[in-house]
Amino acid sequence: MPLLKAKQALNRMDVGQILEVIATDQGSVRDFQVFAVQSGNELLGQTDDGSTYSHWIKKA
């Protein structure tokens, strides 16, 4: 679900804006890496605090 919500949010954003996504699913780490490559958006970073996974994506 976080990936779908991120796609929807990015569609409403202007180029250069940064989206922060916080997820609880460990699989989101790989999902957002693949999404960034496929979509052409830039994955600025990811963090893992053990229970949540944060992702920063820059709209291309």
Outline where the language-model segments fall.
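Short glycine-rich, basic-tinged beta-strand/loop micro-motifs
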Residues: N11-I22
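Small/polar loops that bind or transfer phosphate-bearing groups
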Residues: V21-T24, G45
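C-terminal structural segments of small proteins and small subunits
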Residues: D31-A60
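Amphipathic alpha-helical interaction surfaces in cytosolic regulatory modules
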Residues: M1-N11, D25-N41
